Amino acid sequence: RILPYLALIGLAFAEDGLSGWLRYAPLPSSVSWPYIPHNIVVLNTTKTSPVYTAGQELQRGIQSILGQDCHVSSDSTHESIIVGTLDAYVNAYGNLSQTVNLKEDGFWLSTEGNTVQILGQNERGTLYGAFEYLSMLAQGNFSSVAYASNPDAPIRWVNQWDNLDGSIERGFGGASIFFANGSIVDDLTRVAEYARLLASVGINAIVVNNVNANSTILTPDNINGLGRIADTMRPYGVQIGLSLYFASPTQGIKGQANLTTFDPLDSEVVTWWTNVTSQIYDVIPDMAGYLVKANSEGQPGPITYNRTLAEGANLFAKAVQPYGGIVMFRAFVYNQLNESDWKADRANAAVDFFKPLDGEFDDNVVVQIKYGPIDFQVREPASPLFANLRNTSMAVELQVSQEYLGQQTHLVYLPPLWETVLGFDMRVDNETSLVRDILAGRTFERSLGGYAAVVNVGTNQTWLGSHLSMANFYAYGKLAWDPTQDTTKIHEDWTRLTFGLDQVVIDTITQMAVESWPAYENYSGNLGIQTLTDILYTHLGPNPQSQDNNGWGQWTRADHDTIGMDRTVSNGTGFSGTYPPQTAAMYENISTTPDDLLLWFHHVPYTQRLKSGRTVIQHFYDAHYAGAETAQTFAPRWQSLQDKIDDQRFNEQLYRLKYQAGHSIIWRDAIVDFYHNISGIADDYNRVGNHPWRIEAEDMDLNGYKIYTVNPFETASNHHAVITSSNSTVGSISTTLSFPSGKYSIGVNFYDLYGGKSRFEIRVGNMTVGMWKGDSEDYLGHTPSIYLDGHSARRITFGNVEVREG
């Protein structure tokens, strides 16, 4: 009798992250709870209905959390959990005793007395209410509640950047769960599981393919495959949308007519899109709509034919309008620029392209605007376009996928960053105009608007590649529903649902998360200079010089004496003037510009004093050391929880936190060395370029190795590395230690290139301190590098090593 019990315990602790925050873990014995009804009354028994799904979810969750079996029926009994739409409830039982005001997708939840009421404004609202109730139970919260919950905005979408070949652009959690080999996959099990996660946080639609779309998504076979995806997600109230390639009519798509033009005003093109859209809605009658990227980064669009972006958007809007669909039209439109032109500024592009078109978009067009004017940077001002489209519906584009922010190998909790935008006051007409109110349609009285986020889940069992990154996914849904929620509390809730009710676990993981974005900002790019990553290659590691001397417009304009973009009206690009007057005045002047955006708006000497009293360059030095120091604490804090977290998730996340600890030092050294080199200004604390405890590999005795000059230079501490003489060489490097005898931590910087798995061993005296392989591609999903650079650079540390002088 003992062995089966032990087997069950083992299974309970074998977790891989696939359940996300929907683990429904049994409550610990220390938690007591009141009576929970044993009967679930479902007011819609159609198996494709989200109401039916809600009943099944409640039955599953209550059994798992409380160990209580519930009977599901459609008959009214005393002491039941009643699940259905508000209209269905009124038809069955009459009016509620209190007035309930529900918006689209909203729900009413009451646990008062011995009957639980979960009533939605529509069917998916009912499912949202069921997930809310189960979230309470899973967190051990048995409060008596009676309240209505309504989403702040109607659009709460996710964008996947999945390609038909199964790859995912900026995906760091495995291959696509939707596509492979040019078509839709046969097994949609993971798609159903994904829909469940989406519904649990109130996401109502998903665009399943990349904004850099492939026209073959529109073959009849693929349209039928998309229908299978829609059928799979429909029971969870998740509608699907499609990204479109603007020039599709000219691509010779199998099963579709082939035209010689994609001019949006050409009658044949209009007919082509009308017919294709009709085919899609025949298969997917509830398709949410289209997402369009046009005239951006090489993509075709209406400007190709001297048509406006509004005319391009309206082409699709008219096609989906009869079916109730909407068009999300991306504002991410910009051109290559000449850096020698002091007035040139990519940040101006969105306002330049879209403000003149305000009011020309059809009512079912929503302009989808990245949160900042450039591209998902570690800090940007809120896009001024939010304040410039009074007669056009808008949605913000966020990014859960950490493209520029560590690619899920670094712990970075993003909601505090998003808050800086959603809570920003644009001061339109000198009145309070929070971005979140603009998105909800309150400021400009628009009926459409809301949120889109690039999420990019994949086949990895953790969905995003990292257990802790799932907090960003969860929090996105929660903030899209209610952007006023406290982001620390959101993380605490997520931690309870993901790792259990131990308060030490909750406090430790949440505090790490709260510190993570400031730490990443500190060791990547501060004062509004943007994320100083390699914008020309992987977007992962440091390479500040890649920002300048090209046409991409993410310039820092750093030289020997000065740094930053002058975006003032008086002397610069005029970007500050694209904001409403009060906000423009704040950003126009150095004295009123917040320090954390100083270099975004102003070109200043490195010796410019901040409000803290420090110079810009000293702040760079101090911040990078402080950020990396914080990152060193994450792995030890996580290790303190070892006996409180299952082994698999514990070890998988520990690997990433140790990687982050090493990579943050690589970031720190690269950035401070670069700016020390370019400015010639010393660090007040003599840290930069001064490493008395460091041994340079090129100064050691080399056997089978040769010296190699690294590019960019700052990704090696003395600008050089050593590499084996050939790929088949087994080599060694050695030195005699002159440090005082004692116990040390020894850190080794090395390069882990994609395409090979070198083996390493470090010995002190006759003792092997450690052995490892350059095999991070087996554990990390970040974009790899084939070069010795800031992306392939790693650092591994061995602690408590006995060292004898000599």
Label each residue range with its predicted role:
Residues 13-113, 143-144:
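Acidic, contiguous N-terminal accessory segments
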Residues 90, 181-184, 257-492, 498, ...:
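Catalytic-core regions of glycoside hydrolase
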Residues 1-14:
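Fungal secretory targeting signals
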Residues 31-49, 175-179, 209-212, 596, ...:
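Acidic/histidine-rich, surface-exposed loop or edge segments in extracytoplasmic proteins
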Residues 685-806:
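Extracytoplasmic
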Residues 432-692, 711, 735:
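Catalytic domains of carbohydrate-active enzymes that cleave complex glycans
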Residues 49, 54-57, 61, 96-291, ...:
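Feature activates predominantly on carbohydrate-active enzymes
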